[in-house]
Regions:
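Glycine-rich, aromatic-flanked loop segments that form ligand/cofactor-binding clefts
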Residues: 53-80, 112-138, 158, 162, ...
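Short, acidic/polar
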Residues: 12-25, 112-122, 207-212, 275-285
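Divalent metal-dependent hydrolysis catalytic cores, especially in the metallo-beta-lactamase
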Residues: 31-37, 129-135, 290-294
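Glycine-rich tight-turn/loop motif centered on a GG-T
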Residues: 37-38, 80-109, 142-161, 189-207, ...
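N-terminal small/glycine-rich loop or linker at the start of catalytic domains
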Residues: 1-5, 66-96, 138-147, 176-197, ...
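N-terminal hydrophobic targeting/anchoring segments and the immediately downstream early-domain regions
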Residues: 1-61, 65-80, 363
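Extended, intrinsically disordered, low-complexity segments
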Residues: 317-363
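Second-shell residues forming the walls of enzyme active-site clefts
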Residues: 37-57, 61, 163-330, 343
Length: 363
């Protein structure tokens, strides 16, 4: 039986160092998040993923690869996927001459399914297990950090297009992760740089932004909360709030999958209860609030990765001191995100009928 391995960490470059192999072998580390700096070409990425799996086959290899401006791998054959707003625009476009009223919506859902398949199949062909997608935020025209990453303003359209994208991901053998619960689209501040505050009531948020999480709760395999404070619900950001993660997401909306923190190095994750906190305290807060895994980005390039080592040591110490207990259910949810079937290799994928048809459907 595996121990709960909640830490998702990054690596510095195109190949693993000895220190990184040692970190990845630690039983509290459950996965790796990749960035553009880890990319040279497909052959290098595939080799890096094999190196990671050689350390431990159960390590989850993840990436933010949504399409549009958030796509880490863009060259050497990777399809330049459109932003999710393109599918919402397709949905809202007028029917072509002679078409029925629902034709644009059908075209949009088919295109979103195709995008999910292309996205998942290309990543899996290189050894990546999971992309943190789809974005379920609503586009209010307020948030520059969300913007065209969102499908649409209407939660019904967002839900149907996200379900289509997830269907395509599933066809490729990849899971999914809806973000940023309960919604990041209404606030202007960028949580990478500041602490966004959304002053709406719980009722208003549930009726709009959080609605997709309830409608999709049976098919969402993972969720990533927003580093946003909703003071009429809780004084803590959603990712550190048991009110949001347990009472609302799990009990009220019925979500049973994995909960990832958003990046703990973001500015909005470094302030809790009116004071600055370190990575270790933020990680403990996220886990005790109901999170299954905590994501720590871009620390492998800081002082030789010492912030990661300190976080591992602090979490180990917290376990010994009884401040945190591993959760077998969390580990089951992490392992469930690992692909079950073997991936199609790149050359075979490029000539497969399903892949070529999917490419033809993209906007």
């Amino acid at each position: 039986m595996h121990q709960h391995a909640p830490l998702i960490i990054d690596v510095a470059g195109h190949r693993l160092t000895t220190a990184e192999r040692q970190r990845l072998a630690h039983p509290l580390v459950g996965g790796v998040i990749l960035f553009a700096r880890n990319w040279l070409d497909r052959a290098q990425l595939t080799k890096l993923c094999r190196q990671i799996k050689t350390v431990r086959p159960d390590l989850l290899i993840a990436v933010d690869h949504e399409g549009g401006r958030v796509q880490r791998f863009r060259t050497d054959g990777f399809t330049h996927l459109p932003p999710m707003a393109a599918f919402g625009g397709l949905w809202l476009s007028p029917p072509k001459k002679g078409e029925g009223e629902g034709s644009p919506a059908m075209r949009a859902t088919n295109a979103a399914t195709a995008a999910g398949y292309v996205l998942g199949a290309e990543l899996r062909a290189c050894g990546v297990d999971l992309s943190f997608t789809p974005v379920l935020d609503l586009d209010y025209g307020e948030s520059s950090v969300i913007g065209d990453r969102a499908f649409a303003r209407d939660p019904r359209v967002v839900s149907l297009l996200a379900q289509s994208l997830m269907s395509g991901l599933q066809q490729s053998g990849m899971g999914n992760c809806g973000k940023h619960f309960p919604g990041h689209g209404f606030v202007r501040a960028d949580s990478h740089l500041a602490i966004p505050v959304d002053k709406r009531s719980l009722k208003a948020i549930l009726a709009e932004d959080a609605a997709p999480y309830g409608w999709l709760s049976s098919s969402l395999q993972a969720v990533m909360p927003a580093h946003v404070i909703y003071p009429r619900v809780d004084s803590r950001p959603a990712g550190f709030s048991s009110r949001w993660l347990q009472d609302v997401l799990r009990h009220q909306l019925g979500f049973t999958g994995a909960i990832f923190s958003d990046d703990l190095s973001m500015e909005a994750a470094r302030h809790l209860d009116g004071r600055n906190v370190g990575f270790a305290e933020a990680a403990l807060a996220a886990l005790t609030a109901g999170g299954d895994m905590v994501v720590l980005c871009n620390q492998s390039v800081v002082d030789g990765g010492s912030p990661i080592d300190e976080a591992i040591e602090a979490l180990s110490r917290a376990q010994v001191e009884g401040l945190w207990s591993p959760n077998p259910a969390s580990e089951d949810r992490r392992l469930a995100l690992l692909p079950r079937a073997a991936a199609m290799d790149w050359d075979t994928l490029m000539v497969s009928a399903r892949y070529m048809h999917a490419l033809s459907l993209l906007p």
